[in-house]
């Protein structure tokens, strides 16, 4: 375990070259006395497998201007990584729920399939799944395939990028699993980090053009508990009768190694994939770094004067 501060000044504990599941993380971090991680009275919650095909990049006004000016993404603060997160869609939740039910109850009848009510979205309440942003008022959402293709052409001379298990980072209430994407030309530089494999027991893997994410803690605030009725081959979300429990939540970050390059996209694609986000609470960016919707509309019109399409708002999963 190593300690440090991230670029925003927050204390962090991290384990390089590993994606530690919560059981292992609790053991590794037992001396830290993290009151959220070490909680034991957490209601039962589902462990789905999400097949994610989109990435998101949140930013504030200053970042948006830079992205438009350069028509792409570069690392701030003289760094070498451009950071994205997995962007889970409503279809991803629906598919994950179906897989979870099929795996748990493989012998369901057609009648039981039809009786089953949707439940998984009630557990998808952590910031990982939110339409709100902790980082700024602007969110770019791109197909994963498009990002990787642009990275391949611009940073890898057309070759396939390499993916590695970069690290696990623990904050007070947040666990971040980081995947590193780099050029084959930098194999030696990152050889100390294991390759990201298609391991069905891992927190995250990559297969067939998508990230397969198995969230360790998808709720943050536990308002529901998973109710399993094996005699009926059914699952449901039951309301928690006692006070709601707060727990750690996890997410997956994808760090693209670009050096001092700009990962470029067509300006029209940037505009099409841009949406406005309301501020999450608590936020990471400063309060004055967020903008209201009218301010955002004006800025986007200024930066894309030839595009008259209205600025859309990020929408909730539910």
Locate each region found by the language model.
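NAD-dependent ADP-ribosyltransferases
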Residues: 2-318
